[in-house]
Amino acid sequence: MPLLRKRSLSPKRRSPRRSPTRSPRRSPTRSPRRSPRRSPRRSPKSMTVQSIAFPKNWKRSHITSWLKNHNYHPIKEDSTANFIRFRILPPHRNAIFATKILPNDIHLIMMRNY
């Protein structure tokens, strides 16, 4: 009767056999070429409030209290057909502008310098 080998209770993990002459396989998802080096990402520049436009139906006392409560100090005031606009910062030549409309119908004109 042949001798039986005794098995251990804990399974042993064996590493796969590797040939000493062969190089290790590359994974199929990785390409052999290196990707070109990308330039580091620029940090996003934040936008600042350049001016604030209030609808004409707002009372003057409500406008001044809103500006004071939100810590804005206008440089200049301008009136258009539908809005009263308060300039907070002077505009820059190469700036990018965007308008953000608040729920209470106040328009914030945002500016990003370049």
Swiss-Prot record:
Compositional bias (Basic residues) spans?
1-44
Q: Name the segments for region: Disordered.
A: 1-53
Motif, Bipartite nuclear localization signal: chain positions: 25-42
What protein name does the entry list?
A: Uncharacterized protein 366R
Which source organism?
Invertebrate iridescent virus 6 (IIV-6)
